[in-house]
Amino acid sequence: MTSSYRQQLQAKIDRITTQFSEFTPPTLEVFESPEQHFRMRAEFRIWHTENDMFYAMFERNDDGKQKTVVRIDEFPIADKSINDLMPLLLAELKANSLLSQRLFEVDFLATLSGEMLVTLIYHRKLNQEWEQAAKALAEKLNIKIMGRSRGQKIVIGDDFVVEEFELLNRSFKYKQIESSFTQPNAQVCKKMLQWACDAAEGSKKHLLELYCGNGNFTLPLSLKFERVLATELAKSSVYAAQWNIEQNQIDNIQVARLSAEEFTQAYQGEREFRRLQEADIDIQSYDFGTVFVDPPRAGIDDETLKLLQGFERIIYISCNPDTLYENLKTLTQTHRVTKFALFDQFPYTHHVESGVLLEKI
């Protein structure tokens, strides 16, 4: 481990250990990231000069207003497949004005399973000639391509990739859609999935999952429970989760298109939802013992926190230590922290991903 990686990780460990000490958690489990080639996503502006074109990012100046263009020829934190493709793709784009004209941005989405989706974003309308050129490029480089312009989306192949993780002695396939959220650090994501499954070990009754996304945690966790009800509001994520459940031949998961707040209303009988009836979901038929939450950066709202306090076990994955800290002030009134983990999902940034298991006092 290099000193620069160790230092940034230690700073996160110190911060988390100090911040959460008042909850007397057990020893912090630390899950490191690879030091290079860990990001499965990368987004670059395309910078055009009189006789050149290159990938670029922007660096803010000290005043926070002005930005400096930084040329990017390689990007060591991105997956090796992205780094390998970058110069090949750029050479092809430069050689064909149909593909390079008014090209504004290039986004890469890679997988450990070897698939690659490249999104080309333009400041012009895309025509049939562009589509033919993009098809030839996709074939030549063995990638999927998507062209975007205002009000336009042209898909060459698919607008998604399929990731594959080995876990719990089996393989899990995940549909990852270009515009939807996915965990960017696949190696650390696998460690998070394993940790969550370990935290669920010995659970009885059924699992409720709020904010399930594309079913990232839902699929492996389903092996630890008799029945699972997962909720998610974003339509594209719900469709991806249902595809993932079907592709992985898992038959004990139901997905409800509800927000956490809406689920609370339905669970407490305050409101009926046609969406539940249409999906043939009877919430009252579940006997929940464990709830799994992976909320957005804003954390969990007060009503949902009250709901969580009624469960025997809470597995909480957090992408924001500050909102986790605030939420734990409420949850530790009824539960104690029995597992505590740090996942270095975003090395070399201040972002910290963490996990806690809470069990009823």
From Swiss-Prot:
GO terms for biological process: tRNA methylation. It comes from the Bacteria. GO terms for molecular function: rRNA binding; tRNA (uracil(54)-C5)-methyltransferase activity, S-adenosyl methionine-dependent; tRNA binding. GO terms for cellular component: cytosol. The keyword Transmembrane does not apply. CDD domains: AdoMet_MTases (cd02440). Its EC number is 2.1.1.-, 2.1.1.35. Keywords: Methyltransferase, S-adenosyl-L-methionine, Transferase, tRNA processing. The keyword Transmembrane helix does not apply. S-adenosyl-L-methionine binds at Q183, Y211, N216, E232, D294. It catalyses: uridine(54) in tRNA + S-adenosyl-L-methionine = 5-methyluridine(54) in tRNA + S-adenosyl-L-homocysteine + H(+); uridine(341) in tmRNA + S-adenosyl-L-methionine = 5-methyluridine(341) in tmRNA + S-adenosyl-L-homocysteine + H(+). The active site is at C319, E353. Dual-specificity methyltransferase that catalyzes the formation of 5-methyluridine at position 54 (m5U54) in all tRNAs, and that of position 341 (m5U341) in tmRNA (transfer-mRNA). Belongs to the class I-like SAM-binding methyltransferase superfamily. RNA M5U methyltransferase family. TrmA subfamily. This is tRNA/tmRNA (uracil-C(5))-methyltransferase. It comes from Acinetobacter baumannii (strain SDF). The lineage of its organism: Bacteria, Pseudomonadati, Pseudomonadota, Gammaproteobacteria, Moraxellales.
